Curated annotation (Swiss-Prot):
Belongs to the class-I pyridoxal-phosphate-dependent aminotransferase family. LL-diaminopimelate aminotransferase subfamily. It comes from Halothermothrix orenii (strain H 168 / OCM 544 / DSM 9562). It is an enzyme of class 2 (transferase). NCBIfam families: DapC_direct, PRK09276.1. Pyridoxal 5'-phosphate binds at residues 67, 101-102, 126, 176, 207, 235-237, 246. Homodimer. Its EC number is 2.6.1.83. This is LL-diaminopimelate aminotransferase. The keyword Transferase applies. It comes from the Bacteria. Keywords: Aminotransferase, Pyridoxal phosphate, Transferase. The lineage of its organism: Bacteria, Bacillati, Bacillota, Clostridia, Halanaerobiales. The modification N6-(pyridoxal phosphate)lysine is found at residue 238.
Length: 389
């Protein structure tokens, strides 16, 4: 049977391909040190696990859950925004639970994109922004993120005709893959831009809790007018080491939240209630869970950056996320350098061109590796003949 065009036109998912490549190498006996996928290596905090165990033992959680999420969970999310950002949210109309934020990101274009419609996507960017638009039959239009503009979209450079036709604009700060942060004035300009052109902003805040060196990332929702023009996705995956739990949310503009919820009622059956109780515990439990996590990534970053710079590779210091976005040495493109390092040392860095055309010339280095393995990686690189200058 021939595949549908939507599958034929869909590129392979970057991280699935990375998994396959690393698995092949391990089968061949390679001791792989992967800085590739942003999957925290630490365990979920004990208080969250214990709440999950308690909830699983309660038979009332074993039935079909609510499509939009338990009221208690949605209320906790709303309270979290109030306490952290001073933003009031209606848990009944402005909050919907998600089976991880990726699910909501993938479903949103189906709410608004008809065949041929335009959505703006950051480049480089999380691949799901582009593929979700393609699956909905839309046309993703790249918005370059370049170092000269601090990896922020230049809103004034977006073609007027494109802006008038665009229906969605995916934004993500702190940013994956660049580790960039967005100042408050950028969000204010973004809201004005969206209001002018009647574009729905979809802000992906998956790394909102991973601010380093005392930096506290803002929320799109905290700015005046944000609820009028868009929504924000977030997840418990990265800050609480819960990538496998699949629990997140979307908040903001009520008609967009309603549309996203309507899609979900026809596709999935919601989040297992025991996981939602664990999510409530994550958002209301000890604050030192976040502090321990950010301290860990700061230490790893400092160790790795210092070691790579000693080798002559001038990598930047990220202020948020657990990613270092590093220029490859002269004479290589992203794939060539990543492959060369992997073949020589068994160390994997993700080639930047996997995140889009404007990711060429970079690699993404995830700090989801223990200090011991970081030291081992630095030693391997030091003993190799790889030129970093």
């Amino acid at each position: 049977m021939e595949n549908a065009d939507r599958i034929k036109n869909l590129p392979p998912y970057l991280f699935a391909e990375i998994d396959k490549m690393i698995a092949r190498a391990k089968k061949e006996g390679v001791d792989v040190i992967s800085f590739g996928i942003g999957d925290p290596d630490q365990p979920t905090p004990d208080n969250i696990i214990n709440k999950m165990i308690e909830a699983v033992k309660d038979p009332s959680t074993h039935s079909y859950p609510s499509y939009e999420g338990m009221y208690e969970y949605r209320k906790t999310v709303a309270d979290w925004y109030k306490n952290n950002y001073g933003r009031e949210l209606d848990p009944d109309k402005e909050v919907v639970s998600l089976i991880g934020s990726k699910e909501g990101i993938a479903h949103l274009p189906f709410c608004y994109i008809n065949p041929g419609d335009i959505a703006l996507v950051p480049d480089p960017g999380y691949p799901v922004y582009k593929t979700s638009v393609l699956l909905a039959g839309g046309k993703p239009v790249q918005v370059p993120l370049v170092e000269e503009n601090n990896f922020l979209p230049d809103l004034k450079a977006i073609d007027e005709d494109i802006a008038r036709k665009a229906k969605l604009f995916f934004i993500n700060y702190p940013n994956n893959p660049t580790g960039a942060i967005a100042p408050e004035e950028f969000y204010e300009e973004l809201i004005d831009f969206a209001d002018k052109y009647d574009i729905i902003i979809a802000h992906d805040a998956a790394y909102s809790e991973i601010g380093l060196d005392g930096y506290n990332p803002p929320s799109f929702m905290q700015f005046e007018g944000a609820k009028k023009v868009g929504i924000e996705f977030n997840s418990l995956s990265k800050p609480f080491n819960m990538t496998g739990w699949r629990v997140g949310w979307a908040v903001g503009r009520s008609d967009v939240i309603e549309s996203l919820g309507r899609i979900k009622t026809n596709i999935d059956s919601g989040i297992f209630e025991a996981i939602q109780y664990a999510g409530i515990e994550a958002l209301t439990g000890p604050e030192d869970n976040i502090e321990k996590m950010t301290e860990l990534y700061s230490k790893r970053r400092d160790l790795l950056v210092e070691g790579l710079r000693e080798l002559g590779w001038e990598v930047p210091v990220n202020k948020a996320t657990f990613y270092i976005w590093a220029k490859v040495p002269e004479g290589y493109n992203s794939t060539e350098f990543s492959t060369h390092v992997f073949e020589k040392t068994g160390i994997f860095f993700t080639p930047g061109n996997g995140y889009g055309e404007f990711g060429e010339g970079y690699v993404r280095i995830a700090l989801t590796v223990t200090e011991e393995r970081i030291k081992e990686a630095l030693e391997r690189l030091k003993n190799s003949d790889i030129k970093f200058k």
